[in-house]
Amino acid sequence: MPKIDVLLHGFPFRTDQGIPGFCSSLLITGEKKTLVDVGHVGRRLALQQALQERGLAYDDIDVTVMSHAHWDHSQNFDLFTKTPMLVHPWERKYAQHPHPNDWATPAWSGAMVEFQPDIVEVEEGYEIEPGVRIIHTPGHSPGSITVLVDTDDGVCAVTGDVLHYANVALTKTNPLVFWNERDAEKSISRILDEADVIYPGHDRSFRLVNGEIEYLEPMNLTFAGVHPDAPGVKFDTTPRPPWVMPGVEDQTVESLG
């Protein structure tokens, strides 16, 4: 059966100076090697190292998947120009003309998507290989897709930001909505109904056991260049309220063109 290997872990932390945006990059290995999300340029060398540690070069990847076109998940696809890139047609269209309030999809996003020479538009039910399939899970963005993988651990969902981090499985609320709030809630519920194990966009893999989060891997993160006791360094564990982009109510599938 296919297996999932975490190349880069996602992390949900922010700072008062901006968003690091470290997303998960997952390698699904079965009949093909499928890479889901590639991160931003700040993790370019880390992605290269993760592949090298597994004896892989960029051209060894058979398929890449763009869960959605936000900057933190998609800037390194140019490393894989010899590999087909799967993207939902709604996401591809939206990237050409993003909403002006959408800070996660800059105006250059469309050019970044179209830079790939082999774009494959995929919709609900597309099968990458037996046991690895695409479902359409909109809300966070119009064309967000999740990869469902049949593994020895059950059905695993590689979600991108349909489900940012583990706590979303409890709140059932997407913390960042750029497309449609109701769709986002429905997509979260669908993943929770269909998946045994979840690989979120910005957290470690987990499962729900009796309504509690059970992480499958320990936290492993090192901060360099700053001392925890340095004056002005603070840690804030206050939960962040969810954010819905102003203007989402004006967006429709027809408006994508």
Where do the protein language model's features map onto the residues?
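Zn-dependent metallo-beta-lactamase
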Residues: 1-31, 186, 192-194, 211-216, ...
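Conserved beta-strand hairpin/beta-sheet module of binuclear metal-dependent hydrolase folds
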Residues: 2-53, 146-164
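Hydrophobic/aromatic beta-strand patches that form the interior of the parallel beta-sheet core
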Residues: 5-7, 65, 86, 120, ...
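Short, flexible loop segments at the rims of nucleotide/cofactor-binding pockets, characterized by
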Residues: 11-17, 40-43, 62-64, 134-137, ...
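Active-site flanking residues adjacent to catalytic metal/cofactor-binding acidic residues
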Residues: 36, 67, 87-88, 158-161, ...
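Active-site HxH/HxHxD metal-binding segment of metal-dependent hydrolases
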Residues: 39-116, 229-238
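Metallo-beta-lactamase
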Residues: 89-136, 142-217, 221, 227
